[in-house]
Amino acid sequence: MSARTLPPLDDYGAQSARDSAKNGFSLGALEALLQDCQGQPDWRPRSDLAHAYYDMGKQLTAEKIQKIRWEMGIEPRQTNLIHGVINGVLGMEAKQRSDVRIEADQDEFEDVSDVLSMRMKEATRESNADMAISDGYASQIKGGIGWVEVSRASDPLDYPYRVTPVHRREIWYDWRAQKLDLKDGRWLVRKRWEDLDEAVALMPQFREILTNSVNNNWSSAALPDEGMTTMQPSLSRAWNSERQFSRTIRRDEWCDSTRKRIKFFEVWYRVPAEVVVIHVGPTKKLVYDQNNPVHVEAVSRGAKVSKAITRQIRMSLFAGPHRLIDVPTTRRSFPYIPFFCFRDDE
């Protein structure tokens, strides 16, 4: 797939070379994004409260328990009225679960569809997709929203594909998106803590930056004096990024030096891109790939080719303030699927 990302109208508020990012999110953009997350409607405490009402023994807060004991002189007794009702709804979902079956539009492809159905059944079983969907549905019923990740497994010993539930606290998304699948949303962020040793093992090329950041080891001995350039350029930029980042985001929000952990920000965002498409049917178009012999053959036989403007999904990975990866993808949707129950009109 070849797509030319259109340059942004501005660099998201970049004020220096440290901030700039060619066709991607800068550090300033990440800061603005995180601040935008804080400015969203305050629905998360209500969702946490709804989950607490479902859990056993969490119907009364510590303050209410103390008040009942002291003012009423009785021992508080909690009766969970919603637990059984929700379990009944979840049981109906489990009973109605069925295998995914692929059906061909034409009889001549029936054998192919049978083989694909078998492969789909295997993938569903090995990736525990049914359990992940049930967990996402359960979170949707209890608190209004659930998330499921569909991606490739990073461990070569695991099944190639993984379908796993993701806690709602880890996901932040574009609140302005109207579609239930978020295909009109500009961005989605997943925030999660990672242990330093695992992060370094997966990305050894960033060992020095990650260890210095978690250990807060930007000592004066390792940093250049004014007017000196003895420090490596990458480390110097990392130190400057961390110093600037800490002005707006508290350090304890993304770094745990005691536990040796650092928070990763997995940013998926859409940018305008110009592509060349090949018309393969009245209603179907594909991005033209000049390295694909089938596409080249189709064009030589007279297939129509035209330019179009689309949205390209990029993925940017930050470890705290340190941008590690910013790459384009061929995805048409984010790898995180939302399970919405009701959405507030806000």
Q: Which role fits each region the language model picked out?
A:
Residues M1-R311, H322-T330:
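Extended, helix-rich architectural segments
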Residues L317-A319:
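Hydrophobic/aromatic interaction determinants used to assemble and anchor large protein complexes
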Residues F334:
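Internal mixed-charge
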Residues I337-E346:
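Short, intrinsically disordered, charge-balanced linker/junction segments flanking boundaries
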